[in-house]
């Protein structure tokens, strides 16, 4: 995970107000690697189910329940959880940073999708779908 992704995950684990304001705009696919995606999925599912932020211990237990990851990925996710520090970020700054990151990732993913469509590598969408993918950013 890059630094911004680490900050997003950290604040989702530490700051309930941040979770309530930011989580609706964050998507799993915005994270560049499996570690970030899986951690976000666990945090999101936990918060939706319990309306509370999980402890690090709960996260580790939830990671153990994931079936579609390798042992190496499991180890990386558990290691990332252990590396999360407990210092909250300044609230307005982390919200602004998260908003900017979400916009950048949405644009990047839309552009990558458009390239795939343009090259004929998307079996589900034709070239006419390119403008639609960029409109929905």
Range-by-range predicted roles:
Residues 1-101:
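Noncatalytic partner-interaction/assembly domains of nucleic-acid and motor enzyme complexes
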Residues 135-137:
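Conserved small/polar residues in nucleotide/adenosyl-binding loops
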